[in-house]
Amino acid sequence: MPIKRLDTVVVNTGSQNDQHSASVPPVYLSTTFKVDLNNEDAQNYDYSRSGNPTRSVLQHQIGKLYRVPQENVLAVSSGMTALDVILRGLVLLNGTDNHTPTIIAGDDLYGGTQRLLNFFKQQSHAVSVHVDTSDFEKFKTVFQSLDKVDCVLLESPTNPLCKVVDIPRILRFVKCISPDTTVVVDNTMMSGLNCNPLQLNPGCDVVYESATKYLNGHHDLMGGVIISKTPEIASKLYFVINSTGAGLSPMDSWLLVRGLKTLGVRLYQQQRNAMILAHWLENSCGFKPTRTNKATKTRFVGLRSNPDFKLHKSFNNGPGAVLSFETGSFEHSKRLVSSKKLSIWAVTVSFGCVNSLLSMPCKMSHASIDPELRKERDFPEDLVRLCCGIENIVDLKKDLLAAMVDADIIEVRENGKYLFNKLNKNLAVNTTIDDLHKPLSIYEEFYNQDLIRKDSELNIKSSKL
């Protein structure tokens, strides 16, 4: 039987765990389940903290997405819960009187991840060493300078600077010199449809995602999923979940099963929008380095101008739908995000939703990171992050353009024929509505292939360090 593509397998749930073979899996809200003492071996559920039929259906679906058995998958209450469970179950227990568990993580982290790592450090549960993981030589130097590394925490592209981490190369290096080091990948920015770090050669130990983002896609639930390389790893993590009650609720599990069914079509449109928008920002709006202002830049892994374009393409099926740009001015960026002209773009944190979101990370998602630390890590204070939804791309560009004009960043000239960037003096043809009749094969312009519709199996070429 031929292997089905991933956007097909997440649609079909079958009739698993339903005696009536319903076409849509039911939601089991029951807290407890009757026990048959004469047939205890046949008892799958007793208490929903330990397991629930609806959660099992979800874990089965995620297992199909990542090509692993259902028992390797665990669903929890949020993405941060997922990371907390992973660290408690696999890393913190390595602590002894003579050793504090050591974690190497990136320097462009989600604020919540930074907060959790700081908490463990303050409580002396673990030591976090931050390095630019997109620079392999820096990572290698830091890794070799430490006596023992218990965990490496990776994310690519990084959020929100969109830096590409060479995950395959880091995995080969770490597993070659320190096989016992646990390598964890936060795959939220890509989702299992675009990347499967478990199937790299060698694969990572654990992947997790905030299911609040792409997997659900509607921002009407909070959830997280953990996908382990082996059942043995999953068993350790399940112990933490069962002990603490961190499992995802039945209703949220049911909503997530439903959201997963449209992952393929949602992500296709979101990535298409992101590609067109990034090209428009860089070329028509002039957010690229110029002689008068080298601080302006568009950051997106789907742009050929991105130096890591080929690297990202080598182990991912698509670019995702998160991009960011720098205006070159903190005040102008703040005016843009605060503009009352925005009617489609919602000013809020998070990403992966069907509606488009806009934010200023230094004031929102990354506000919990100390300003001095942001400066030390070269985090641009004027950075504006865009998370594309599924709306019509022309409407998205018009809405953003109106806000940029209102913020005194862009001036529309000659009855809309040209766009003039007031901050870096770039003048370019206005292509705001040019994409109205372009075919949906915009992927081919960037990658020379239709990424979402191609076979989802990655062909990873092994190479030496």
Swiss-Prot record:
Gene3D superfamilies annotated for this entry? Aspartate Aminotransferase, domain 1 (3.90.1150.10), Type I PLP-dependent aspartate aminotransferase-like (Major domain) (3.40.640.10)
Q: Where is the signal peptide?
A: none
Taxonomically, the superkingdom here is: Eukaryota
Sorted keywords for this record are:
Amino-acid biosynthesis, Cytoplasm, Lyase, Methionine biosynthesis, Nucleus, Pyridoxal phosphate
Q: What is its EC number?
A: 4.4.1.13
> Does the keyword Glycosyltransferase feature in the UniProt annotation?
no
One GO BP on record is: transsulfuration
Q: Which GO terms describe its cellular component?
A: cytoplasm; nucleus; peroxisome
Instruction: Please report any disulfide bonds recorded for this protein chain, giving both cysteine positions.
Output: none
Q: Which residues carry this modification: N6-(pyridoxal phosphate)lysine?
A: K213
Cofactor(s) demanded = pyridoxal 5'-phosphate
Write out the catalysed reaction.
Answer: L,L-cystathionine + H2O = L-homocysteine + pyruvate + NH4(+); an S-substituted L-cysteine + H2O = a thiol + pyruvate + NH4(+)
Primary localization: cytoplasm
Q: Which GO terms describe its molecular function?
A: carbon-sulfur lyase activity; cysteine-S-conjugate beta-lyase activity; pyridoxal phosphate binding
Q: In which pathway does it act?
A: Amino-acid biosynthesis; L-methionine biosynthesis via de novo pathway; L-homocysteine from L-cystathionine: step 1/1
Task: Fetch the Pfam families from UniProt.
Answer: Cys_Met_Meta_PP
Q: Where in the cell is it found?
A: Cytoplasm; Nucleus
Q: What's this protein's family per the entry?
A: Belongs to the trans-sulfuration enzymes family.
The family database entries (PANTHER family) matched by this protein are listed as: CYSTATHIONINE BETA-LYASE, TRANS-SULFURATION ENZYME FAMILY MEMBER
This chain's protein is named Cystathionine beta-lyase
Its taxonomic path starts at: Eukaryota, Fungi, Dikarya, Ascomycota, Saccharomycotina
Task: Please name the gene that encodes this protein.
Answer: STR3
